[in-house]
């Protein structure tokens, strides 16, 4: 039987392409992980990738976290400031949990957020969704 382990590293970017806030990872509980020279703090979140109709490419995704003041305020700021979200999914050695290989690197545009009493969902869309098709030559 094969064992697999993955971690998601996430960072928000401003419209000026500058990283902002705290980078987060969702694998090592109450610990920090360093990836590519950047220190990521733990946050309990999940990434949900949606399917899209644009040539088979995904055009939406979401980042889901528990409803707490930090998540709600961060997601509200990300929507208000029109942040982008960088997500790096990395495979881990299943015995040592050290980073092995970059599986995916994605940039998403923050679109909106929804919340209820247990979770807050940050809705993400393709960065290309911000481009008006008529203006593309």
Predicted regions and their residues:
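Surface-exposed, interaction-prone regions used to assemble/regulate multi-protein complexes
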Residues: 7, 25, 30, 62, ...
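Short, acidic/charged, Gly/Pro-enriched secondary-structure junctions
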Residues: 7-18, 70-112
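Solvent-exposed coil/turn segments that connect beta secondary-structure elements
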Residues: 66-68, 90, 115, 127-129
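Conserved small/polar residues in nucleotide/adenosyl-binding loops
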Residues: 136
């Amino acid at each position: 039987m094969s064992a697999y382990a993955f971690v998601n590293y996430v960072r928000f970017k401003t419209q000026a392409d500058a990283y902002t806030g705290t980078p987060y990872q969702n694998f090592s509980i109450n610990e920090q992980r360093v990836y590519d020279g950047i220190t990521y703090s733990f946050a309990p979140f999940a990434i949900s990738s949606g399917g899209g109709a644009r040539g088979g490419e995904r055009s939406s995704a979401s980042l889901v976290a528990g409803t707490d003041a930090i998540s709600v305020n961060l997601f509200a700021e990300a929507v208000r400031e029109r942040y982008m979200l960088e997500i790096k999914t990395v495979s881990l050695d299943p015995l040592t949990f050290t980073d092995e290989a970059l599986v995916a690197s994605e940039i998403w545009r923050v679109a909106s957020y929804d919340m209820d009493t247990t979770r807050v969902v940050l809705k993400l869309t393709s960065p290309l969704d911000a481009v008006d098709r008529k203006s593309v030559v």
